[in-house]
Amino acid sequence: MGFSSLLTTCRYLLYSGAGNSFILGESMPSLEDVLFLCQEEMVDGFLCVESSEIADAKLTVFNSDGSIASMCGNGLRCAMAHVAQCFGLEDVSIETERGVYQGKFFSMNRVLVDMTLPDWKKAERKLTHVLPGMPEQVFFIDAGVPHVVVFVSDLSKVPVQEWGSFLRYHEDFAPEGVNVDFVQRKKDDLLLVYTYERGCERETLSCGTGMLASALVAADIFSLGQDFSIAVCSRSRNLIKIFSEKGKVFLEGPVSLLNRSENFGWLEPKSRRFG
């Protein structure tokens, strides 16, 4: 494959959302661009931020395999940080495939988004078959993308790649497949979560919707009440806060700018449009 056209024609940034790594660009990439750049930069996905007629910006999320994700919690927070700093905003709205999401930019260490959905489609499932040592009881939830949450007593003993790949392609969740979250409850309000991500086809250092899914299921099965607050730690050891207030559910955590292409003058004053 030749040198990617996106590297020479477009500006892009490298972001991390609590360990979830992304390339962010302001124009729609080709499939070739996504595959090349995600492999070249060893990131989890590509965030395309464009102008929107109904929000401050529009976000399209590409997985590292080139497929489009309907939602990505950490990617959404990275996009909100980008838009907030481009336009000098605190309150930010982002149009996505799942609708318009509202968020708040306090600082790069604290970017919050309202992840509330009208129906989480939560359901406990007994798997038709499992690998040796794997729990049969799992929890399905739609947190913007489909997740299966598996509670374990000791995450250090879980073969995340093997079990994650098995469940991601499990016949019980065909044909779409699922993201898979392995969860250990460390304290009443602290979870450790390792996620195998569909579209990356491997464990990632962090997954926003996976942390959200795990916290929502934990709040139910451990009877934490309607208004709860849970800290979630991922493989990256970054903490994400998931909390519920007055029927709304929020995802809050850090965002980091890792690098930028030489011609990306993203801090230059902008009008309220991209492109």
Curated annotation (Swiss-Prot):
Species per Swiss-Prot/TrEMBL record: Chlamydia trachomatis serovar A (strain ATCC VR-571B / DSM 19440 / HAR-13)
Kindly state the subunit structure of this protein: Homodimer.
Q: Where is this site: Could be important to modulate the pK values of the two catalytic cysteine residues?
A: H147, E197
Listed name of the protein: Diaminopimelate epimerase
A single GO cellular-component term from the record reads:
cytosol
The protein's superkingdom reads: Bacteria
PROSITE patterns, alphabetized = DAP_EPIMERASE (PS01326)
| Similarity annotation | Belongs to the diaminopimelate epimerase family.
The protein's matches in InterPro entries, at most eight in alphabetical order, are given as:
DAP_Epimerase, DAP_epimerase_AS, DAP_epimerase_DapF
Q: Report the locations given in the UniProt record.
A: Cytoplasm
